[in-house]
From Swiss-Prot:
<keyword id="KW-0157">Chromophore</keyword>
<feature type="site" description="Tyrosine radical intermediate">
    <location>
        <position position="161"/>
    </location>
</feature>
<keyword id="KW-0359">Herbicide resistance</keyword>
<dbReference type="GO" id="GO:0016682">
    <property type="term" value="F:oxidoreductase activity, acting on diphenols and related substances as donors, oxygen as acceptor"/>
</dbReference>
<keyword id="KW-0464">Manganese</keyword>
<dbReference type="Pfam" id="PF00124">
    <property type="entry name" value="Photo_RC"/>
</dbReference>
<feature type="site" description="Cleavage; by CtpA">
    <location>
        <begin position="344"/>
        <end position="345"/>
    </location>
</feature>
<comment type="function">
    <text>Photosystem II (PSII) is a light-driven water:plastoquinone oxidoreductase that uses light energy to abstract electrons from H(2)O, generating O(2) and a proton gradient subsequently used for ATP formation. It consists of a core antenna complex that captures photons, and an electron transfer chain that converts photonic excitation into a charge separation. The D1/D2 (PsbA/PsbD) reaction center heterodimer binds P680, the primary electron donor of PSII as well as several subsequent electron acceptors.</text>
</comment>
<feature type="binding site">
    <location>
        <position position="342"/>
    </location>
    <ligand>
        <name>[CaMn4O5] cluster</name>
    </ligand>
</feature>
<dbReference type="GO" id="GO:0010242">
    <property type="term" value="F:oxygen evolving activity"/>
</dbReference>
<keyword id="KW-1133">Transmembrane helix</keyword>
<keyword id="KW-0460">Magnesium</keyword>
<comment type="similarity">
    <text>Belongs to the reaction center PufL/M/PsbA/D family.</text>
</comment>
<dbReference type="GO" id="GO:0045156">
    <property type="term" value="F:electron transporter, transferring electrons within the cyclic electron transport pathway of photosynthesis activity"/>
</dbReference>
<feature type="binding site">
    <location>
        <position position="332"/>
    </location>
    <ligand>
        <name>[CaMn4O5] cluster</name>
    </ligand>
</feature>
<keyword id="KW-0813">Transport</keyword>
<feature type="propeptide">
    <location>
        <begin position="345"/>
        <end position="360"/>
    </location>
</feature>
Length: 360
């Protein structure tokens, strides 16, 4: 008997690593974008958790009045945040080695920049990883295009807006109440509710929720029954089956009669494209709106635009909103400036026309 031995060429360690990274047989696909994503998101997550729990107060306004954001300094889950870096730092890149000491780095809010920059690189890489996996599986690339909407939104509030305003202290705090504070101040300074791109974003988010609920309920209501009355209809579907699991003709007929004929889709592909495109385009517009308002191209101003025949102002909801904006602007950064710029820039209102005569 003859035994034939084939010599197996052992691949180098680097080649094995390359094959593992790009293999679509792994339980979770890594990919080249994933290598960088794992490193940056781990760094951002670890720094965020440590800073949220134990970071000392940060001099966010650059006026030597630190703001506490961590749990160990009296906050809870709702009020806690990683406080943005100091206004004294501005737009300067502020890694640990740029500070004279670790205490100075913490006092000036260095962890905020560390978390934000690594987080943004991480989500960019996640988007690239979606494209990479689609490419290797022979799929079309639209999944990463859809994900670009939240990526654009995060980039707008964490990077574009601080650049436009001239300081990372104007970036969105990394916490729940800090996010709400950011929203209030953004409304006060930029009147975002009156910006058409924000309106398109609201239509995209709420409309997407409505269309998703409508689609899910129509499909669930028009399933092709494959089970008995005593079994769940969900058991009638087998993963990978070729047959349609619901009757699109029935769903089309129902919705066409409920609204009108042309409000209903008769093409499943165009329907699902619409379901994906509506919220994505809306969030794109909101991100674009925040990016333009970053450079103070603000929402519409219809203040005092309705006058009576005598020239007196008839207040509209725009005037009510303007009053709320001024109130919010007075409240924020109350120690950094004594008066909102909108009010301080106006003409002085006389409180007395003539000095009162005393003792005639």
């Amino acid at each position: 008997m003859t035994t034939a031995l084939q010599r197996r060429e052992s691949a180098s360690l680097w080649q094995q690593f390359c094959e593992w990274v790009t293999s679509t047989d792994n339980r979770l696909y890594v990919g080249w974008f994933g290598v960088l994503m794992i490193l940056t998101l781990l760094t951002a997550t670890i720094c965020f958790i440590v800073a949220f729990i134990a970071a000392p107060p940060v001099d966010i306004d650059g006026i030597r009045e630190p703001v506490a954001g961590s749990l160990m300094y009296g906050n809870n889950i709702i009020s806690g945040a990683v406080v943005p870096s100091s206004n004294a730092i501005g737009l300067h890149f502020y890694p640990i080695w740029e500070a004279a000491s670790l205490d100075e780095w913490l006092y000036n809010g260095g962890p905020y920049q560390l978390v934000v920059f690594h987080f943004l690189i991480g989500v960019f890489c996640y988007m690239g990883r979606e494209w990479e996996l689609s490419y290797r599986l022979g799929m079309r690339p639209w999944i990463c295009v859809a994900y670009s909407a939240p990526v654009a939104a995060a980039t707008a509030v964490f990077l574009i807006y601080p650049i436009g305003q001239g300081s990372f202290s104007d970036g969105m705090p990394l916490g729940i109440s800090g996010t709400f504070n950011f929203m209030f101040v953004f409304q006060a300074e930029h009147n975002i509710l009156m910006h058409p791109f924000h309106m398109l974003g609201v239509a995209g988010v709420f409309g997407g929720s409505l269309f998703s609920a409508m689609h899910g309920s129509l499909v669930t209501s028009s399933l092709v029954r494959e089970t008995t009355e005593t079994e769940s209809q969900n058991y009638g579907y087998k993963f990978g089956q070729e047959e349609e699991t619901y009757n699109i003709v029935a769903a089309h007929g129902y919705f066409g009669r409920l609204i009108f004929q042309y409000a209903s889709f008769n093409n499943s592909r165009s329907l699902h494209f619409f379901l994906a495109a509506w919220p994505v385009v809306g969030i794109w517009f909101t991100s674009l709106g925040i990016s333009t308002m970053a450079f103070n191209l603000n929402g519409f101003n219809f203040n005092q635009s309705v006058l009576d025949s005598q020239g007196r102002v008839i207040n509209t909801w725009a005037d009510v909103l303007n009053r709320a904006n001024l109130g919010m602007e007075v409240m924020h950064e109350r120690n950094a400036h004594n008066f909102p710029l909108d009010l301080a820039a106006g003409e002085a209102t006389p409180v007395a026309l003539t000095a009162p005569a005393i003792n005639g």
